[in-house]
Design a protein with these regions (language model features):
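Active-site mouth of glycoside hydrolases
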Residues: 1-158
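Hydrophobic anchor at the start of a short beta-strand
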Residues: 55, 173, 304
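A short linear-motif detector with a strong N-terminal bias
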Residues: 72-76, 108-109, 126-129, 151-154, ...
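Generic secretory/membrane-interface signal
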Residues: 80, 94, 145, 170-171, ...
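Alpha-helix C-terminal capping segments
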Residues: 87, 165-166, 296
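Extracellular glycoside hydrolase catalytic/binding regions
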Residues: 92, 99-236
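Aromatic- and carboxylate-lined catalytic core of secreted/periplasmic carbohydrate-active enzymes
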Residues: 181-184, 196-318, 328-342
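Short strand-edge motifs at loop-to-beta-strand transitions and within beta-strands
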Residues: 323-325
Length: 342
C-alpha cells in the first residue's frame, strides 16, 4: 500500500487526504504532516490486520504529479523518520523502500542506503524490508534487504526464475508483479487466469512467493487501481494453492538436481522433503503427459494423489505405491502429483 497517491493510467483522481498539509493548487507544506491522513492510514492498516493481511507499506514511488517523488534528501529523511516511527508498532507492517526505485533516477544509491539506515534506526521491531524494481535490479545482496521484492523483467520467464534468484541471493524471493490477470492494453496486464495460476504454482513449488493483481477494464472500477470486487478466475485457485501449501510438512524445499536424479526430474519442479523421503509435490504446468514413471526411494511406500490445480480437484489413486511405478495422467495442463510416505 502506498503512502503517497499514485498518478498513472486508470488512476488519475486526487485522493481525499494527503500525508502533508496543503493541496495541489496552493502547494504542500513539507514541514507539517496531516494528522487526518495518518489516522486514516492507521485505521486501514488495522483493518488489514483484522483480516489477516500483511501491509507492505510503499514509502516512495515515481507515479506522481503532486511533487512527493521530487522531495529533496532532507525532506525525504524527515518524512521517513515520521512515517516509520508512527507505523512501526503495527505487527503486520512491512517496509517497501520504493516501488520501482529505478524510475526515480534523481535519487542515488547513496540516497537509498541512507533511507534504509533511517528505516532501521526508527523501527526497533525489525520489520521486513525490501526495494522493488521496474527494469534495473537494486543490489539485493545488501544486508539491510531482508527479502527480494522483484518484478519480472522478462516477458515470458517469470516465476521460473525463482530457482535462479534463490540461489543467487540466498534470501526469500517475493515476485511482486508477475503480471496481472486482465485485458488492458499493457503487456503486464492481460494474462489469463490460467496463466496467473500457473505462475503462482510454478513460483511456490520453486520456493518463492508471489503477489496477485487484476486489471479488467469493462468494470466500473479497476481492482488494481481502486480496489472493489474481484472479477477474475484465479483468486479461488490461488486460495486452493494456499491450502495445498499449508499442508506441506516442515523442512520441505525445492528438489536439488543431481547426476543421480536429473533424468527423472529435470523437466518439472518438485517440492519435497529429501531428508526422510516423506513428501513429494510435482507440478507440470503447461505440460500434459499421458503418464509419468517414478523410481520411488527404496524401502518407502506412498499414498499418491493427482491434483487438478485448475478444477481444484484432488484424486487419490487406489492402493499403496512403492518401487518402480507408472502413474496414468489425463493429458491435461496444470496437473500436479503429490506423494506422501506412509
Amino acid at each position: 500500500m502506498c503512502i503517497f497517491p499514485k498518478f498513472y493510467t486508470y488512476n488519475t483522481a486526487d485522493p481525499e487526504y494527503y500525508a502533508f498539509e496543503g493541496n495541489e493548487k496552493d502547494g504542500f507544506d513539507f514541514t507539517r504532516f496531516n494528522p487526518v491522513f495518518w489516522e486514516n492510514l492507521e485505521r486501514r492498516i488495522r483493518q488489514l490486520d483484522e483480516l489477516g493481511i500483511e501491509a507492505d507499506v510503499i514509502l516512495l514511488h515515481p507515479y506522481d504529479r503532486w511533487g512527493f517523488s521530487k522531495m529533496d534528501r532532507d525532506t525525504d529523511v524527515f518524512y521517513l523518520k515520521y512515517a516509520v516511527s508512527r507505523l512501526c508498532h503495527f505487527k503486520n507492517v512491512w517496509w517497501a523502500l520504493a516501488n520501482e526505485f529505478d524510475l526515480l533516477p534523481w535519487k542515488s544509491v547513496e540516497d537509498w542506503e541512507l533511507y534504509a539506515r533511517v528505516v532501521m534506526c526508527r523501527d526497533p521491531y525489525g520489520h521486513l524490508r525490501s526495494i522493488h524494481n521496474c527494469v534495473e535490479l537494486y543490489d539485493q545482496t545488501r544486508p539491510w534487504i531482508t527479502h527480494v521484492s522483484i518484478q519480472r523483467i522478462d516477458v515470458y520467464k517469470t516465476a521460473e526464475a525463482v530457482s535462479e534468484w534463490r540461489e543467487l541471493y540466498q534470501k526469500p524471493i517475493v515476485v511482486d508483479e508477475c503480471a496481472y490477470e486482465g485485458n488492458i492494453n499493457f503487456g503486464w496486464g492481460n494474462i489469463t487466469g490460467e496463466e496467473m495460476t500457473r505462475r503462482f504454482w510454478e513460483g511456490c513449488i520453486r520456493g518463492g512467493y508471489l503477489s496477485h493483481g487484476e486489471v479488467y477494464v469493462q468494470h466500473e472500477q479497476i481492482w488494481w487501481a481502486h480496489g472493489g470486487r474481484l472479477h477474475g478466475t484465479c483468486p479461488d485457485r490461488i486460495a486452493f494453492l494456499k491450502d495445498i501449501m499449508a499442508d506441506v510438512p516442515e523442512g520441505c524445499a525445492p528438489l536439488k538436481l543431481t547426476p543421480e536424479n536429473h533424468e527423472a526430474n529435470w523437466d518439472v519442479p518438485c517440492l519435497c522433503k529429501e531428508s526422510d523421503h516423506s513428501y513429494y509435490l510435482y507440478y507440470f504446468g503447461f505440460f500434459r503427459p499421458a503418464f509419468r514413471t517414478y523410481e520411488l526411494p527404496k524401502g518407502c511406500a506412498y499414498e499418491i494423489e493427482l491434483i487438478d490445480t485448475w478444477d481444484m480437484a484432488i484424486q487419490k489413486l487406489p492402493g499403496i505405491h512403492s518401487g518402480n511405478i507408472k502413474i496414468g495422467m489425463p493429458e491435461k495442463q496444470y496437473m500436479a502429483i503429490r506423494m506422501k510416505k506412509i
